[in-house]
């Protein structure tokens, strides 16, 4: 049986492109002989029934991912994971619009592929955003460059022995400004760059990608709003703040954290957020709960026993709160869900407002 991602909630069909970028002016921090080369999936509102179904993962990437996690052949084979049905279409025609769409950059967790945020990306695009998910080279289990070249993971061996994980979020805070230059600058690398409203840009990330969101905001004033989903702030927020820009902190259930994993970075960095801010936790959600993995795990009978919230419900909450946050702060659309607890979402606990 083929797995399938949840359908987007927005009004628009979704198109998807792949864009391989090379920064000729910056060497890769993990492979110094190579130029830095982010690989993007770009999602946008599209005309329905144009293009062809977009694949989820390349088989070599799926195999590398499952092998690294010790799940190869145990719960799912690479071909099944790669064949997961998405709700975006390659080669689709962009939806004509008199207005441009805000841009949102999504950065995945460490060792995770950009595909792990596909459910969120498709939903945001269906609501009227251009979304760029980013594979940061040599930081995931395998990045398949167009043409078939596989970039294997190199970063872990360099940051874990000496505890220098902040190098990852610091490096991504350099990746994203380059991506913005190539998407919104005078020499755009994307054929549909005209769709982007460069005056309204947001960034969200999972785990270390969430830490990269605040680090990028500190480095680049073009990013107007940010979201950290369950990520330790490895790169501290500057004491002077983020220029009064809004920031959402959305985390898993603290009761599910191992006792030997204290994380005070959210408390430590909260006072430095000097704009609109919220800190929320989701009861029953584990660390992967803000990605596609729990949804797909439920479908193959591999649900983590210590994370009782279903994958479907985890994604409903993630898409609702992240989407409403960007609607409010990039498009000026009221989002009462963010004002306080609601009976419709009893799992969501407001810790700070």
Language model: regions and residue ranges:
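Short substrate-entry loop that stabilizes the transition state in hydrolases
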Residues: 84-144, 255-259
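Active-site machinery of serine-nucleophile hydrolases
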Residues: 43-47, 57-64, 69, 115-158, ...
């Amino acid at each position: 049986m083929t797995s399938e991602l949840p359908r987007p909630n927005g009004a628009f069909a979704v198109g998807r492109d792949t864009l391989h970028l090379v920064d000729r002016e910056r060497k890769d921090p993990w492979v110094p002989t190579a130029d830095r080369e982010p690989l993007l999936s770009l999602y946008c509102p599209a005309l329905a029934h144009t293009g062809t179904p977009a694949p989820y993962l390349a088989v070599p990437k799926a195999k590398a991912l499952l092998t690294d996690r010790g799940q190869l052949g145990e719960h799912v084979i690479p071909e099944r994971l790669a064949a997961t049905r998405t709700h975006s279409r390659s080669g689709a025609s962009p939806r004509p619009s008199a207005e441009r769409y805000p841009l949102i950059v999504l950065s995945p967790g460490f060792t995770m592929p950009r595909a792990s945020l596909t459910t969120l990306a498709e939903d945001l695009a269906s609501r009227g955003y251009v979304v760029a998910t980013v594979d940061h080279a040599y930081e995931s289990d395998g990045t398949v460059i167009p043409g078939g070249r596989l970039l294997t993971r190199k970063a872990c061996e360099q940051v874990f022995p000496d505890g220098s994980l902040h190098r990852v979020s610091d490096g991504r805070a350099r990746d994203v400004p380059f991506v913005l230059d190539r998407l919104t600058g005078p020499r755009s690398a994307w054929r549909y760059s005209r769709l982007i409203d460069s005056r309204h840009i947001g960034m969200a990330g999972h785990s270390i990608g969430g830490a990269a969101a605040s680090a990028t905001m500190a480095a680049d004033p073009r990013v107007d709003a940010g979201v950290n989903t369950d990520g330790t702030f490895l790169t501290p927020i500057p004491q002077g703040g983020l220029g009064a820009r809004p920031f959402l902190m959305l985390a898993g259930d603290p009761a599910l954290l191992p006792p030997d994993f204290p994380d005070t970075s959210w408390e430590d960095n909260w006072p430095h957020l000097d704009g609109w801010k919220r800190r929320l936790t989701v009861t029953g959600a584990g660390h992967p709960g803000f990605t596609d993995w729990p949804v797909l795990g439920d479908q193959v009978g591999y649900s983590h026993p210590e994370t009782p919230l279903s994958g479907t419900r985890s994604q409903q909450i993630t898409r609702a709160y992240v989407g409403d946050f960007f609607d409010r702060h990039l498009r000026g659309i009221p989002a009462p869900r963010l004002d306080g607890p609601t009976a419709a979402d009893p799992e969501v606990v407001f810790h700070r407002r």
